[in-house]
Amino acid sequence: MGKLIMWNIITLDGYFEGEKSWELPFLEIVWGAEMESFSLAQLNNADYLVFGRITYEGMAAYWKTAEGEIADFMNRLPKIVCSRTMDSADWNNSTLIKENVAEEIAKLKARSNKDMYVFGSANLSETLIKENLFDEYRICVAPIIAGNGRYLFSKGLPERKLSLISSEQLKTGGVIAKYESLK
């Protein structure tokens, strides 16, 4: 069975996007050869990419026409989009889950040989945190205090104890921390 892994990039003060959806200027700060290598390693070990609607729409709009090794992975890998409001998912290899999201993700996880990655998707991530489905959290902290935006984790989530697996400092100043969920 593969693991369900959250992957996100946040600012030092905890924001994963600006005040507007897809406002992500801090990504440029941490992106470089190391982050590209890290991203490719994750994609190479993925059975599925899992998104909420907003992240799915943004990712699809970008990656459908992008070129390069990461784009090839993003377009080739099976994608799961969890949304009650979408009627279809047209990005290559996409499957739409409209109901019983946690139950359906748990079933996919049980059948997976490799890992499943949730990128962005704060609302979906909250659902999966509440259901205690994440096995691992991978967070890259960008060396910037944004001062405002949307927090990755909202108030009122249940406590989840974690254990640090590893941390890696990037030449860009970012730090990737990997935490295991202590279910």
What are the functions of these language-model segments?
Residues 1-183:
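Enzymes that bind and transform nitrogen-containing heteroaromatic metabolites
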